[in-house]
């Protein structure tokens, strides 16, 4: 791992000498009667004077003698098995010894204490936090970090709580990096930012005996758009057609079905998407809610594969700008799935309550279900894991 990532162990005083400083059950200490060459590093084991070295050897001998006398019984407590993916850090009379393992390790009673160190790759997440970008946008950003310990001695001697220290380091590095960038750069260059965070975090954690293998930046939601950005959202081509289809249909309905004097290309876009459903009730209602148009336009994207993947029935209680609440359903339990106005025929698996603007942001991929739930913009009644499967529905819109 160290050779692949380009990191190497740095000389850190007595820490490097710990690897060769213990032999036999007495654990001979280099520098017992004279100081080590090169001085003593910060936090390292200081050289022993000859009285201290003599007492250390005598007590260790008595501990080993006690182990031999009571071996049939003490063997159950003194022998420890260390698996391949672990190392055991042993402290004898408070002084650190060579990392032990894998295999069977013998500990002396009363004078040895130990701590196991897991060398396998582990992961943690940086909880989503609100950050302000360079252009004034407010966004909720988190990160997933994978790391492993390459020096068990350093991981025990330098930091008390390694997980918390690494998480705080990753969060601070992420905050500093995102404050210097505008929102568009954060969204378009997440991989580049993640690689930069990887290097910055490793610059700090490699002195702790820890190496970060991967950092994945996750933008949960954009809570506030940039101050100097245009009002219109950036949509992909499919969602632009979906929005133009509904908005164009609403304008024609308000005009009583008469041709709109607007641009011809907008009229053509509406006519291309809308022919399969000329009898939709939206034409008879001059003030059709935006949520109804967006939800019913999901029907062409539903499929049997999506039904088998999700397999749930959702009820959406959408709060309209007027303050009233309207109910819609998305049934992905049978056939190709259904979507429409009103409550479902059976009992829904999940009831989702949100504002109409948040629903629009959700369908336009400006807001993710998890980010909306954590920020309080989406309220869920029922199985939360089932509600998070709405992400599969949003992916079907691509």
Curated annotation (Swiss-Prot):
SMART domains: PHB. GO terms for cellular component: intracellular membrane-bounded organelle; late endosome membrane; membrane raft; plasma membrane. Pfam families: Band_7, SCP2. It comes from the Eukaryota. Residues 287-398 form the SCP2 domain. GO terms for biological process: lipid transport. Ubiquitously expressed at low levels. Expression is highest in brain. Residues 79-398 are cytoplasmic. Its main location: membrane. Keywords: Cell membrane, Cytoplasmic vesicle, Endosome, Lipid transport, Membrane, Phosphoprotein, Signal-anchor, Transmembrane, Transmembrane helix, Transport. The keyword Coiled coil does not apply. InterPro entries: Band-7_stomatin-like, Band_7, Band_7/SPFH_dom_sf, SCP2_sterol-bd_dom, SCP2_sterol-bd_dom_sf, Stomatin_HflK_fam. Belongs to the band 7/mec-2 family. PANTHER family: BAND 7 PROTEIN-RELATED, STOMATIN-LIKE PROTEIN 1. May play a role in cholesterol transfer to late endosomes. May play a role in modulating membrane acid-sensing ion channels. Can specifically inhibit proton-gated current of ASIC1 isoform 1. Can increase inactivation speed of ASIC3. May be involved in regulation of proton sensing in dorsal root ganglions. May play a role in protecting FBXW7 isoform 3 from degradation. This is Stomatin-like protein 1.
């Amino acid at each position: 791992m160290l050779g692949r990532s380009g990191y190497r162990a740095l000389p850190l005083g007595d820490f490097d000498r710990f690897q060769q400083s213990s032999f036999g059950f007495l654990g001979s200490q280099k520098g017992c009667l004279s100081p080590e060459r090169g001085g003593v590093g910060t936090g390292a084991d200081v050289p022993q004077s000859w009285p201290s070295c003599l007492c250390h050897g005598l007590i260790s001998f008595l501990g080993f003698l006690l182990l031999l006398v009571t071996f049939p019984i003490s063997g159950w407590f003194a022998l420890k098995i260390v698996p391949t993916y672990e190392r055991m850090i042993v402290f004898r009379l408070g002084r650190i010894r060579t990392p032990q393992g894998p295999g069977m390790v013998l500990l002396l009673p009363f004078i040895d204490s130990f701590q196991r160190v897991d060398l396998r790759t582990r992961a943690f997440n940086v909880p989503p936090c609100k950050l302000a970008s360079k252009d004034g946008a407010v966004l909720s950003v988190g990160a997933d970090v994978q790391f492993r310990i390459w020096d068990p001695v350093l991981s025990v001697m330098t930091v008390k709580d390694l997980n918390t220290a690494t998480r705080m380091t990753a969060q601070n590095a992420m905050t500093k990096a995102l404050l210097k960038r505008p929102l568009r750069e954060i969204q378009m260059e997440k991989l580049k930012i993640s690689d930069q965070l990887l290097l910055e975090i490793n610059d700090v954690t490699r002195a702790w005996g820890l190496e970060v293998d991967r950092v994945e930046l996750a933008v949960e939601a954009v809570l506030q758009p940039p101050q100097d950005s245009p009002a219109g959202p950036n949509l992909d081509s499919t969602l632009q057609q979906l929005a133009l289809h509904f908005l164009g249909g609403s304008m024609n309905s308000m005009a009583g079905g008469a041709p709109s004097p607007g641009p011809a290309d907008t009229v053509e876009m509406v006519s291309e998407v809308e022919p399969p459903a000329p009898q939709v009730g939206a034409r008879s209602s001059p003030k059709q809610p935006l949520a109804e148009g967006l939800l019913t336009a999901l029907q062409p994207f539903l499929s049997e594969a999506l039904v088998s993947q999700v397999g749930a029935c959702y009820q959406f209680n959408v709060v309209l700008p007027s303050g009233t609440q309207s109910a819609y359903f998305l049934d992905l339990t049978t056939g190709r799935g259904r979507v429409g106005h009103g409550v479902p025929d059976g009992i829904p698996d999940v009831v989702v309550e949100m504002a109409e603007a948040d629903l629009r942001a959700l369908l336009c991929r400006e807001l993710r279900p998890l980010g909306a739930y954590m920020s309080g913009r989406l309220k869920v009644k029922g199985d939360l894991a089932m509600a998070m499967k709405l992400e599969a529905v949003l992916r079907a819109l691509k």
